[in-house]
């Protein structure tokens, strides 16, 4: 810009122009524009399953995204958000719940609740009135547990957690029944109510489902439903001295909310038997269908929430939203748009088997989106003065440059032009390196939108 008050760095160069008024602007056309499905979208088997149900007459569709508020969401969660909320758009009247599975108060905080809500909205989705917490259902879950105790399907175990683990057996060996497995219903009810009243220390008792200690499915070998944990909850305070385990709270929360499809990642595939068992014992009408899909694994990228927490706690990064982090907040600070993330997830697809996705696919989606949406602006970081010797000293004109050559609606901007300009020092070499095609003595280059220049001489201070 000829009128900018910039420092003049040496060396200075003097250049001779050619055909100043006859030069055409250089344009760039992006490969594609954002929005809608990409031409190279990958298969989505969950979408196909749900669509088949709709085609067969399903009239009700309730999805849910159930994060635990113990950290910031990363790009793997973004895939789950997009999958669930997009499915809820397939049927009029359908919706997707945002439910916080807040059953482990030791690691949860309202900061994470707020950040998760911000990320979901930023990705372009709304839950409306359908925001819930597992803690909303603590009393209902407790009452359901009482029903299982009365039905002889749950009991209070007074073994240590270590003894319970050892008694589970293995894939090749049946489990060992707890010596407290055959307690009477009355004794179990009395102990469970005393657990609720806070009369016992942590580790004194747990409530276990009474299923089958010889089952080939280890999850069905009398899993723990409740443990004593005297830690204040971010919503309920000290009201509850015990908390439900994930496998107990999750499925029943789905049922309470009327969820039709519980979409989760493959690590929960071996939880499905227990998920269904609880629903059957409680007599849930039209129980949710659990469907598992492959989680997102990116090359050269850590997506373990526990590992990311260590980076934050140790001060290796400035926070969960550090631009180097693979969190949604970090990507947002890096300048990534929600359209780019949605396009990336669309190309990855939803598969049944775990695999690694090359991180270059994410980078390509980001570049493609930026190319289609970013205005073309120019700046000089390390200025080098250019004097156009055969241009009138007192003349000044302007050239119109497209803000985005691939998007006419983006408009244009006027770029001033005069005898003295500034280019970046990186664009000039007095002795050019191999394959250097920018400014050097005797070489001809084009100024974007303006003219051709040839370096005539170099003047040094």
Spans of features found by a protein language model:
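Active-site cores that bind ATP or allylic diphosphates and position pyrophosphate for catalysis
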Residues: 98, 102-104, 110, 147-308, ...
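N-terminal catalytic cores of NTP/NDP-binding nucleotidyl/phosphoryl-transfer enzymes
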Residues: 41-51, 55-117, 234-265
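Extended, domain-scale alpha-helical bundle/helix-rich regions
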Residues: 319-412
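Conserved short loop/turn motifs at secondary-structure junctions
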Residues: 66-71, 99-107, 129-139, 162, ...
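A glycine-rich helix N-cap at a beta->alpha junction
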Residues: 112-135, 154
